Amino acid sequence: NIFLPDLMAFESWSSDTNTVIYDKRIYETSSDSWDEEPSAQEAFKKFTSKHLRLAKDKNSAFITISVKHQSPFLAKQWTELVINKVNEFYREKDKERSEKAVSYLNQQIAMTSSSEIKQVLAELVQDETKKLTLIDANQFYVFEYIDPPAVMEKKSEPSRALICIIIAFLGGISSVLLV
């Protein structure tokens, strides 16, 4: 699970010690207490709006999942967590669906007297049993790594050069307008 202070009370990250510094106005690490504890809904909204990025390639239908965070280690950890949770959710959902189908088909086999219908139902049970076996066999169920999450070595943003250029440009415009 995502450690809530890493998401909601994050202030900065020390690359030298690989430690997270929390905003003491929001979260006090020594007492493990919040000024006002955020709700799950607030945390979800912040995670999906500020950190999680999903992109689908129109040509290949590949989905890219990425997480942005000042700490590249947290970004990697959260990316792996999202992928694992989605895989686990859909695996369990499909497993439950197949188990219900097998149960229903077995009931129908017990209730029918026609040998032809029993044979067709038995084949359907066999197909669902194959699905169940494959569901448990795949480590990656929905999402599979093409390029596994990695700790990025270079900062992705903000671009200091771009910020300096914009500030210089705005300074030049304001000096022309004010003079």
What positions do the PLM features span?
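Soluble oligomerization/assembly scaffold segments of membrane-associated complexes
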Residues: 2-142, 148
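Interfacial amphipathic helix/helix-coil modules
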Residues: 128-170, 179
